[in-house]
């Protein structure tokens, strides 16, 4: 093995060992299911913000997004614009009110439990519908993260993809299984800092190594016309993007309102004061990271010779790090640390997804429906067993090395966003929303995405293929419309439900003394 490879391996070993130590440290502190899933609602602003954003962006930000821009031009940047808009709106209009409402709604620990308590669902319809949607779409989402980890190890060390996939899955499972929510949040905080350092530093160094005057010529030499490639209103071939193309890309913003692994961070923040701090930190981190993720692709076009094939474009950041630190600067250990930044992005999402899926099974299905009188320690044991089971299923889904990270994330993002985004917003801001409307919204959002993306028409194409419109936009609209129509056509909310809504709106009787 080359010395460069040995130093990179040493960096990875230190990093992975550190994550496992954090998990072990928090294992003794995790004594109940509330500790395991929400950390006792004790997150400070910095940890909440960076863990939320790190779990949001995942390996997609450092592999999927740069890969899409690298292969298909800066017209893909509209996705990043949509994500930034969604992040800002989520922190601005959802974070504080959702935290207050989950406290007011019988101290709800999970998103399905919040919806059950918010709508006084005595028959557990919302609980079951929501839990099923989370399990289905999060299995795909978790698989995308594990797949990204496998591809990372495979690209760097040349080890068989399945072996790489196994290593990544075991480490992520290890600290999530041991430490639960607080271990996940603390590791995500560290990983968020590492991601930011890597995404900013590497493209800047590569840009100066290329030289500003050579960028345009090098991009053209890579096989694309630079003026077309750098026009955000064009695709890589110079064709003008249609309105549907741009709407579909901006439509990624809608997903934020329904992402359980992000929303659970809002629920766990220690106070309204910390919510306000988290908003600023989270939005600034997101803006910087997304801008530089796109910059990685543009600089990569000019810096990497020969150009990467489109089916290898998701490796652009990996290739840049290796070239910068193994050849041009000669600091392979530092390069290994920055490669750990990609692993950090992957792990920070996979761990959160494992935890949310496990909470849906153990807390929402087992504890609420099967064994409501089970002791907290038994629920905690079931939670850990569920984490293991979910990881195994996601691992099986991820075994195909040809699966696209961007494609897997896109499908899961649409499913979760359409299922939960509309009902979260309406539950927080529309007083008239009732149980029937909520159930119709979650079910129709999930089904719309499945039909749009997976049910073929007569010619073999899906509606998504035929129209080019992102399924999230369709599913979100269908869900929102049905929530309104069904709520208006059925029984009004009870007086207790209306009082709870007013209390949360006014910031009283909900565990806080101020609005946020």
Located regions from the model:
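Residue-level recognition of pore/gate-forming positions within transmembrane alpha-helices
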Residues: 16-19, 55-56, 83-87, 134-135, ...
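Helix-loop-helix junctions that connect adjacent transmembrane helices in secondary transporters/permeases
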Residues: 70-178, 265-410, 512-516
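Short, Lys/Arg-enriched, Gly/Pro-containing loop segments at transmembrane-helix junctions
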Residues: 32-37, 103-107, 214-219, 407, ...
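Membrane-interface "cap" regions at the ends of multi-pass membrane proteins
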Residues: 1-63, 176-179, 204, 211, ...
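Alpha-helical transmembrane segments of multipass membrane proteins
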Residues: 20, 152, 156, 170-177, ...
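A generic transmembrane alpha-helix motif of multi-pass inner-membrane proteins
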Residues: 1-23, 430, 435-516
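Membrane-helix interface "capping/anchor" motifs
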Residues: 179-188, 428-440
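Loop-to-helix junctions at membrane interfaces in multi-pass transport proteins
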Residues: 2-5, 38-43, 47, 64-81, ...
């Amino acid at each position: 093995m080359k010395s460069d490879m040995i130093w990179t391996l040493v960096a990875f070993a230190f990093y992975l060992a550190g994550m496992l130590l954090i998990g072990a440290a928090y294992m003794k502190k995790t004594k109940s299911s509330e500790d395991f899933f929400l950390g006792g609602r004790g997150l400070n602003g910095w940890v909440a913000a960076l863990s939320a954003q790190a779990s949001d962006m995942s390996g997609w930000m450092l592999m999927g997004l740069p890969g899409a821009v690298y292969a298909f031009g800066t017209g893909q940047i509209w996705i990043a614009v949509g994500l930034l808009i969604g992040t800002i709106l989520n922190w601005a209009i959802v974070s504080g009110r959702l935290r207050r409402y989950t406290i007011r709604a019988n101290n709800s620990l999970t998103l399905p439990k919040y919806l059950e308590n918010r709508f006084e669902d005595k028959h557990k319809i919302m609980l079951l519908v929501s839990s099923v949607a989370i399990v289905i779409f999060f299995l795909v989402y978790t698989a995308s993260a594990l797949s990204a980890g496998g591809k990372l190890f495979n690209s760097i060390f040349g080890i068989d993809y399945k072996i790489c996939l196994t290593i990544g899955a075991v480490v992520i499972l290890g600290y999530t299984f041991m430490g639960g929510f607080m271990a996940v949040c603390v590791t995500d905080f560290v990983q968020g800092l590492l991601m930011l350092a890597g995404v900013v530093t590497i493209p800047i160094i590569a840009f100066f190594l290329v030289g500003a005057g050579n960028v345009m010529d090098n991009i053209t030499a890579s096989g694309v016309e630079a003026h077309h490639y750098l026009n955000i209103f064009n695709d890589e071939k110079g064709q003008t993007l249609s309105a549907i193309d741009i709407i579909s890309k901006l439509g990624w913003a809608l997903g934020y309102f329904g992402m359980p692994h992000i929303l659970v961070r809002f629920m766990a923040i220690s106070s309204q004061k910390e919510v306000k701090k988290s908003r600023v930190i989270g939005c600034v981190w997101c803006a910087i990271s997304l801008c530089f993720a796109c910059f990685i692709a543009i600089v990569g076009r000019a810096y990497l010779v020969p150009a990467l094939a489109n089916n290898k474009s998701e490796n652009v950041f990996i290739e840049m790090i290796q070239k910068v630190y193994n050849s041009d600067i000669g600091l392979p250990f530092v390069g290994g640390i920055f490669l750990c930044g990609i692993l950090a992005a992957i792990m920070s999402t996979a761990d959160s997804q494992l935890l949310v899926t496990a909470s849906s099974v153990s807390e929402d299905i087992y504890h609420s429906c099967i064994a409501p009188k089970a002791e907290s320690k038994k629920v905690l044991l079931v939670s850990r067993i569920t984490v293991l089971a979910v990881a195994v299923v996601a691992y099986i889904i991820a075994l195909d090395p040809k699966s696209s990270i961007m494609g897997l994330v896109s499908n899961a993002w649409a499913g979760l966003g359409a299922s939960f985004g509309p009902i979260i917003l309406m539950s927080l801001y529309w007083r008239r929303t009732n149980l029937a409307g909520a159930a119709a919204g979650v079910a129709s959002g999930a089904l719309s995405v499945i039909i749009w993306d997976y049910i073929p028409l007569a010619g073999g194409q899906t509606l998504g293929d035929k129209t080019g419109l992102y399924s999230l936009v369709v599913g979100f609209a269908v869900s929102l419309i049905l929530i309104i129509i069904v709520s208006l056509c059925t029984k009004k909310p009870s007086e207790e439900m209306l009082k709870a809504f007013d209390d949360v709106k006014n910031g009283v009787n909900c565990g806080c003394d101020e609005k946020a």
